[in-house]
């Protein structure tokens, strides 16, 4: 007899694999061999990114062998009732994360249009989907019932929508399931359109399988057979030779064993009959989980021989009895039943099966039942009030400050044997992204006020102003012994709406309503603080530089520019304390659609804004209000001379625990590098820079810091550089390198003067060539001699590796670099150092002397303005984040197909379901060209809701294709983020549904959670731990 707790069980739901999932970006093969001139930094650190591999792919598929004529005739009729269900759970809810998937169902009422499938297909939360019949007719489906416990649900479709085939329904005959019966499982196995798998029923009295932390069925027996079904077969009918459905495919083993688990159809048949009659499907509970235990185990628990004899005489074929497994605290049976009680009678009726117990409880909601159990050989009779199972199953949720919340469900309570009470975080995002876990938190209090249920939580959140920092107390459902306490930053500006969603079983949708407008932020108050003092540090300069460091935390409400994270924390260097200017790595502040918090002296937290983003050299300049900081912040003194190889220096950095470390060391090398491009999704990277490495192991452990001299002058910044994502493990590489401060000074001086630097750059990426290579490529001996004299420490020139795709409006007739050009001079200045390329910043055109194909030539090379390189607009449509191709895209592509670039997409959205993947360009909507976001917005606004439309797209590798997408304005309304300096956050959010959102503010839906988005075609969302 199997007990509950089958670790190898897996539900048969397939991840979506539509034909629209085309190759979007070819990964380069990983190799340790460097390309010519490659100077990739060698000290990259790899960070784990979750790899969600579908274990169901490991299952063998067991197709049916040649069938008899009777079986063939049966199957021909059955397949006309089987449908392929393609669906999304549009946001995380209860045990399920937002996702897109496909499964199977079958028609059980052709006249009224009812389809039976699994509960984990119908989804506990918002569902959106359609079904495809055997003749490939498509029809929308909506949920009309999902059972609170058992793994079945009922969908409804419009029978009139099926015009080209006669609808057939399968008769449910649960009593036909017998041990030894030959069966067929007819469904979409492994995502295929139709698979027919054969098997033989081996057991009828198996306990329901446990699927782990997610949804699991209980309080029912399951049927076991060997059919080797795989992902996508969830909801398949299990039919006998008479063509009757005798069970419902639900799950199986994921360890390679050809074992499948079927749900008996007794309770689905009752629910269907209630729905047909227009009656509610009543479900009763005493909040107790029962399991089947064989008689030998029951005897050990205290079943007396007399009662065993009575049971065996009354039910000669039975070999097991029901035993209490879990009694929930504060439930009707709490303090009355105990674990291990053997159930004998309910209301005076002897029973040994779940079906009869369910029948009694479902017909006794609100009434009292009498239970007779044996406990240690003693008869114990108790009375329990039967509760309503639907009342403890969440049918509403609230989204606020980026997170999604509902009352704790009976499913979760049963799994962890806790009371069905509390506020459950089903989408831990935005302000409520706690300890880097996406869901599973129970919020005990917010702002020192208890939140025992969702209503109390809403009342507390109504009173908290925007940008407030409040204390929350919480526990994770998997570790209720440990209570966590955190300070969270309440975001009601990126997420202004507090919205209530309520399930509507009449429409199959969840109805949204606004609960409260945000309270404006309180004016900031100046604070006092002192910096720590380093004990035992022999270098006075290191002790002094502490006053120039601040901690920078950047939170992004939306994934843009291919950046993989929603939050990043590190340290910045104060370069002007009077003006509040801080230099920080661009791997921490990648773009300005963000919230930046600066922590001074580990005590004062102030907001900051982006002042400048360098397009090439991996630093950002941010600014906080210094009047709010009453602390002895010190402006760092920056060196004006470049640090040299072999020079002694003091390394001051911050380790992974954000603790300061100091080491006296020396510069080992200064190498011209470009951070490797990310193949799966272009994102910002530093190019054409001199990277400094030092002789200390601390350098690899610290992502931020400085190199300083004995006089306390900062010789270099120590920055983290976001690198590529490895194709095998889907892990991001981060490099830690030094950046000489003299390269920072020209830009910084302009910012200090209140002038916004308007840099111009050369539209290319270069790498170093040595003189041996240069000679072979046609550089004359005269020039080689000049190089050796101009740069005695490094005899090198620069070769053009890649010419960026020019921005719109660029003069295509102008001279440009070509790949392979060797640059000798720019405006007459010999170029042998990266810093000498800075001449490009101020000039519209440069006269370049180059060697091309072995010949020297002069060309007039135009520079490119950087004002348009940063993203200033994003359109969110059907769950896809669309933007103008950012700089990293232009660096890696040779031709821009349009200015509508897919930057990211949300799980559970139409873009995810239909395969509109990141790194694609959209060139037309319904045949109308859409060269830019304005034209795109204009065309898609004409499309009615719930209607298919065609998108012509081009992959990053120039492969054109067409994808059809169905619009969904209810769950994924179109909205925009537009840069607007008049707004406090620098951006404003606009809704395109003016009738529905008259205030123009886009709805704050859980599907805009950046942690639920993927920015690369590999589909991996970043969940790297970011300790606070």
Swiss-Prot record:
List the residue ranges of the region (Serine protease): 82-266
Q: Which intervals of the chain are annotated as region Disordered?
A: 1-49, 983-1028
Q: Where is the composition biased (Basic and acidic residues)?
A: 990-1001
- GO cellular component terms given for this protein: nucleus
Compositionally skewed regions (Acidic residues) per UniProt: 1012-1028
Residue ranges occupied by any PDZ domain in the UniProt entry: 289-374, 876-957
Listed A to Z, the keywords are: Apoptosis, Hydrolase, Nucleus, Protease, Repeat, Serine protease
Enzyme's top EC category: hydrolase
**Is Hydrolase included in the keywords of this UniProt record?**
yes
Q: Which residues form the active site?
A: 120 (charge relay system), 151 (charge relay system), 233 (charge relay system)
A Gene Ontology biological process term: proteolysis
Q: What role does this protein play?
A: Nuclear serine protease which mediates apoptosis.
Name this polypeptide is given: Pro-apoptotic serine protease nma111
Q: Which organism is it from?
A: Aspergillus niger (strain ATCC MYA-4892 / CBS 513.88 / FGSC A1513)
